[in-house]
Amino acid sequence: MPIPELQSLPVLVTGGAGFIGSHLVDALVLRGASVRVLDNLSTGKLENLRASKDRVELLEGDIRDLAACQRACEGRALVFHQAALGSVPRSMEDPASSIHVNVTGTANVLAAARDAKVRRVVYASSSSVFGDSEALPKREGEEGRPLSPYAVSKWMNEELGELFTRAFGLETVGLRYFNVYGPRQDPQGPYAAVVPRFFDACARGEAPLIFGDGEQSRDFTFVADAVLANLLAAGAPSERCGRA
């Protein structure tokens, strides 16, 4: 499956100042796309866009604001929807915020994209959708029950994506990220991911803190591979749209 031609293509990246989003922005700019970013900068950082700032249009706004989404989608051919509250622990402490941002926000992005005649929306789902399924390897169609409000929100994103494809003809593709890590990932704060925490501890000459007996395993994805998945999804055949 080839990466589509992106030269001069008008695209939107929601959450484009964030960890994954900013790497995606860099890749799109490198390929000549005309990039617009929508980000409320609550977790995203302007410094993440330093390499591409002169070639990116930045709209500061929130995906919970439909009008902001409509302005951002205007004139775009392709949308990469990365904006979200991305922490399972945070969703357990504050489920309402995760649902509001991740579900209402995604519904707004999809509705704005539909109304602006955007061709395709590639959005970030999550491996958490597999829930309590013990099946290995993980396959689509073998999902279990969700284990957190965050997982519920991402499952609802997939349902919304499928609905908008079926009901309105808006092409959507969801990507179930597995524990993405890499540069620009914040090692600080109560919801920091394990890989940047390990690197941060090692940089300070400390031993990484491992809970349990150390026999547990997780699947990790380097951020450049997540970016490549987004680019490939942008060029996937239309018959594959409407599903994660």
Where are these regions (language model features)?
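N-terminal Rossmann-like NAD(P)+-binding domain of SDR-like oxidoreductases, especially those catalyzing
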Residues: 1-180, 224, 230, 234
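Generic signature of intrinsically disordered, low-complexity, basic-rich segments
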Residues: 13, 120, 170, 188, ...
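Short, charged helix-to-loop "capping" segments that act as catalytic/coupling loops
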Residues: 69, 187-191, 237-242
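Short, polar/charged, Gly/Pro-enriched helix-capping and turn/loop motifs at alpha-helix termini
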Residues: 105, 136, 187, 208-209, ...
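Glycine-rich "substrate-gating" loop/helix at the edge of Rossmann-like oxidoreductase active sites
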Residues: 147, 178-192, 207, 212-224
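Alpha-helical substrate-binding/gating segment
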Residues: 180, 196-208, 220-244
